[in-house]
């Protein structure tokens, strides 16, 4: 009892001191607006203090770190890698986090609610591990499927990427963590990534490579944007006023801060004038060189203030001054369950002849084979790598699901030995994949090593072969027609073994769709010349224009291995009754989806719009999707709304979106190549 009054006095002393501090430092008064607080803070800073806040300054524990200013009550500012969990590779000591499935798996869900939950987990763990910013999501369009960072993105379609990216951002930021959407813009290859000059025409840039960034700002309300490595039409993105000022701030209303990618800044004056707010990783351009530029009158101190205000305003708006993030234990059991759920939802059933899947729980023997069957595939390589809190490898995952079955593991290094094992098993499950990584592109979409030979040998030995593909993007499958079932699992994350088992045995009915086209051959890609990719003499020509992904396949009349939007279920669905009508400057399409099978399941209804031929657009473009969950025999009317922007193209004469007049075609179905419903629409 004796200590009680003393504790009370101490607490009262702290609470009474707070207004005094706020009076001397009004920016610490949470009753004021973020804009006012930021302005008051910057006005109180010395020039040296201002410059110290323009760039990262690694310390003994953190690489991506802006140090505090105790005199002014400015907290330290820590930045974490994303986008599939808190990637702490730069921290010392490194901190484990939940390794979620790759965002390519997230994109496969075609589900904005799932994307928001995914982001919410990333944001919560980023804050719990005492960081202010999550560098993600990565929403660059998959122009080149061989890109080493395909796994970090969300596919090839700007409409899909924009919808899911905005939802992911909203989820990240629910926890007071700032989402830093990246890489702005057209960061589409790793080869020569820090110097490549991408020649992109104005229409293509605005129709394919910018709309999803616009959504990240206008719908996701991203607090930060990372400017990318490449040049676009001769100008590095981090010193490109057309991108950082004209588009981002003036046209889209962005109020947050722009941070450079690691070493992506190339100037002091140019970057400052363009609107790059924060240099990563050190002060090469925004340190002493910035101070000298100010003293020489090349950059005004007012401009320095203007560069600082957006980050401080964002920190105030996110409560990071009033409640800085502190280390907090992670709810690992709950987040493990979420990681498993995300992985299951993102797996795409590519092929399932004779309804081989789901497997029966009564199976007696399973041959588990392949280089990706030995341990969990938690993610790709590079800055996005997450140190998992735990892992479920494929073997224990299968054994836990079917404890009565004999499951035997073979790493697949000897196809003949693996085939012999498969021949003696009731079912063979072959796990193959790739190892995409930041910093280099894949030389081919073919599986490395002997994996193709392995699948062929096992399939020949056992007619009940299931192939599970763990890849970051498309891979070639010369054996596809010889195996009855193919499950695209992407990089499933730390719950790999449990999630794959859940889908194989029907605990989950797959409903995911491909967010990227799987070609049949390396040459079957839009950027298929050296001039287009990786470029010649440091220049990559985007001469394919608008024909990227499924748009190119449609325009060329070429059949892919598996089309964009494709994905099977353990049940079947039918579409009927399409009705399209104009509503103001937009339109609505209404149709019926019916579950014609014997299991409950979900279908993703996709709407594609074909423009009048004179518009010069690809044959069809995704403009809407809707996920529908149905019991056997159940049907539901679905409505998808189209906005005026959906009927517009970028006019290079007016430098603006312009509505197209004429006859449009609305198509509805379950993939870009399976569209049973069609209706004309005159505008």
Task: Mark where each language-model region is.
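Short beta-strand elements
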Residues: 674-683
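Bacterial N-terminal signal peptides
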Residues: 7-19
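Glycoside hydrolase catalytic-domain context in secreted enzymes
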Residues: 22-650, 656-658, 663-673
